[in-house]
Amino acid sequence: MSQEKKVFKTEWAGRSLTIETGQLAKQANGAVLVRYGDTVVLSTATASKEPRDGDFFPLTVNYEEKMYAAGKIPGGFKKREGRPGDDATLTARLIDRPIRPLFPKGYKHDVQIMNMVLSADPDCSPQMAAMIGSSMALSVSDIPFQGPIAGVNVGYIDGKYIINPTVEEKEVSRLDLEVAGHKDAVNMVEAGASEITEQEMLEAIFFGHEEIQRLVDFQQQIVDHIQPVKQEFIPAERDEALVERVKSLTEEKGLKETVLTFDKQQRDENLDNLKEEIVNEFIDEEDPENELLIKEVYAILNELVKEEVRRLIADEKIRPDGRKPDEIRPLDSEVGILPRTHGSGLFTRGQTQALSVLTLGALGDYQLIDGLGPEEEKRFMHHYNFPNFSVGETGPVRAPGRREIGHGALGERALKYIIPDTADFPYTIRIVSEVLESNGSSSQASICGSTLALMDAGVPIKAPVAGIAMGLVTREDSYTILTDIQGMEDALGDMDFKVAGTKEGITAIQMDIKIDGLTREIIEEALEQARRGRLEIMNHMLQTIDQPRTELSAYAPKVVTMTIKPDKIRDVIGPGGKKINEIIDETGVKLDIEQDGTIFIGAVDQAMINRAREIIEEITREAEVGQTYQATVKRIEKYGAFVGLFPGKDALLHISQISKNRIEKVEDVLKIGDTIEVKITEIDKQGRVNASHRALEE
């Protein structure tokens, strides 16, 4: 990489974009500093000197949010950044997906992309800056990379598309779309939307691609100026004679029939047996440890299986389980299967099954998100778990990984637009989707299961949501789009295009591909085919439960809303929180108080809610002119008595207002602790209350 500092500038969505090379991180294979407005990201690309064994490309993308970038000190005892949060993990995945297909086939060197956010301007997306930085770091390095690529964020406000909307604009946008690609095609899409149509989504994607093309041209100019020398990479060549022999054996032993097996586990077992039979043909009795040859034969077999699956789909329009290209697997669903939970839904599609379980909590149970932006209170959460047994395997039980975090976030995006507002449903909602069986499209099964759980729980959602995953097999001059892909089609196909939405429109999409990019024609056809599939699944779900239940579970907390004057909030809280803690200790309720005076009281026991409400009403109660009260004498003065109307509110009962008869001394008729009925006659501008007993005698 060049050791001389060079600076390149352009404009991006009305803000300055600067890329600097040659000054920082010079021992990395490639490094750039991206300045976008006040956002600054350092992106580096490093590759190992030797390739790794295995049949996969070891690419790792990291995205690190440094709290100093937003002028914050990390929380916790150690006061330093820990493991990446969910948002950082999702951004790393977002960058990985458009970059991964653009490395040479067979390249097995470890490649690590590091993105460090050094300064964060919320209106100048650090995520999109890091995507451009990752592309540029690879492009100016000696690592073989068929880029550059770029990514943009697209919003949709009042019928107009916007590139990289500000935080304020995102609040009112019907679309939050991230799209990436190279000059000729789109190769990554991620979006959340408020029921927008397929045509609106298509236009948004290619509106974004126009800006991507300009950014790619800018990057290419930098590459042409720097002229990096790339590593020479020559893929290993197959022994054609060996390939032909293995191919002949697979035909002999019925590869087509082995692939065309409905049951996933049976198919996998049959393929393993077929491979073992063929490998045995090559084991030299005199040299049983000929591992290189055996490894080569296995690699050829895997390629032949892939070719056969793709040939069957593209040429014969037959899928491994016998379905047509646009056919959905058998569907089954149930609700209310877990009696003590607040809501549950079981959704099964073929050999993929998800159990979604919903829990309702008080508003105070929200998740606090403390990242580079302002603190955020999240009251709807969707979590996704993928245990080993779901694919018939064993292994260590670990914390959720990148894939589980990503699938959980996709489901959350798909569902958050149908979640009712706090005013209509004052609860925190958490859904956990447990994948019990998987043969592809488990993330979309979790979306369907979560919709069932929401309706089973009685959450007044705006509309049901269903999800489906689309696949693609391309040939030189043709392509076949697949509806509801299974695991083998995902692994051996060219695309995984997930689409979720209501009957009216799309709420989330996610597209990953293994080829260079997709044309407008393919994306348009895939969206339409997904719409038809989504509606078919929706109709099935509505036969199980057609609307949210009218009552919550008996085990769910009940939430009552009441309103007090904002200046009374301090009375309810008390000094150091003393009063509110007393209420909670006595009743066991959860109390959430908003700045506008709205109070949410939550508990399973309605009697405890009622008691908490009574206490708050007593604390915040105000005297009213004309009302009568049973008051208690608290203090006696020469000019009258101070009487307590109710806790926290006293009134002056003037000596002239005690009786219609003349009184010489207050003590002659009243003593401390006496009860006397009074009527409120005046409340002055300072809030002082005057009362009268005489008015009740006249």
Swiss-Prot record:
One cellular component (GO) term of this entry: cytosol
Leading EC class: transferase
Record: residues binding Mg(2+): D490, D496
Domain KH: 557-616
Superkingdom: Bacteria
Keyword Transferase in record: yes
Compartments reported by the entry: Cytoplasm
GO MF, one annotated term: polyribonucleotide nucleotidyltransferase activity
Secretion signal, residue range per the UniProt entry: none
Disruption outcome: No visible phenotype.
Domain S1 motif: 626-694
Pfam family for this entry, one: S1
Family per similarity comment: Belongs to the polyribonucleotide nucleotidyltransferase family.
Self-association and partners: Homodimer. Component of a possible RNA degradosome complex composed of cshA, eno, pfkA, pnp, rnjA, rnjB, rnpA and rny. Interacts specifically RNA helicase CshA and RNase J1.
Role noted for this protein: Involved in mRNA degradation. Catalyzes the phosphorolysis of single-stranded polyribonucleotides processively in the 3'- to 5'-direction.
Protein name per Swiss-Prot or TrEMBL: Polyribonucleotide nucleotidyltransferase
